């Protein structure tokens, strides 16, 4: 459970950081650009392409993986957090969870 809370915390600050970064002109391309770092017990990857950015979080223990998505749809920023255990394809659609993954809300603290 602690692993899930850590992943959700990282997703939360990533989304907040990307919302602010986009306000100033563009999405950040790394956690370092956002002033963030991750725990050594998780593998993280930031993907930024055009109007979307994603943070993939894969804890080294367990099979649950996470992704935070921030997407500009032309009029507003859309955000989504997802978790799942199945591998995902490289074909991602805007602000949609990977196939077989579940969207979830991260409570604000």
Residue positions per predicted region:
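Periplasmic/extracellular, small/polar-rich flexible segments of pilin-like filament-forming proteins
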Residues: 23-109
